[in-house]
């Protein structure tokens, strides 16, 4: 069995899905977390992310990293 984490960061939210992948190709999702980041609404006049947007994204990624550690993830795909 391999433990896989998939991270998707979109314009409105970030999601972490952790699954167990078995040798026969079957999988079992064991954790799913979604955080509303609203990045599309947090840009400055030059269309760059604000410092607050970057800070909240970093905090979310720290939370995701912690969960990956708890679930002893073998591989992360982002």
At which residue positions do the language-model features occur?
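Short glycine-rich, Thr/Ser-proximal phosphate-binding strand/loop in the N-terminal lobe
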Residues: 14-51
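Conserved phosphate-binding catalytic cores of ATP/NTP-utilizing and phosphoryl-transfer enzymes
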Residues: 1
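Generic hydrophobic secondary-structure packing signal
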Residues: 53-56, 74
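Short, well-ordered amphipathic alpha-helical segments that serve as non-catalytic structural scaffolds
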Residues: 56-67
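Short loop/turn motifs at secondary-structure junctions
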Residues: 10, 31, 72-75
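Short beta-strand-loop/turn "lid" adjacent to the catalytic site in phosphate-handling enzymes
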Residues: 66-78
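Short glycine-aspartate micro-motif
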Residues: 4-8
């Amino acid at each position: 069995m391999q433990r896989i984490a998939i991270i998707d960061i979109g314009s409105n939210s970030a999601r972490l899905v952790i699954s167990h992948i078995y040798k026969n190709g079957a999988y079992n999702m064991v954790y799913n977390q979604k955080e509303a980041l609203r990045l599309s609404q947090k840009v400055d006049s030059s269309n760059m992310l604000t410092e607050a947007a970057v800070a909240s994204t970093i905090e979310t990624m720290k939370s995701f990293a912690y969960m990956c550690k708890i679930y002893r993830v073998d591989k992360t795909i982002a």
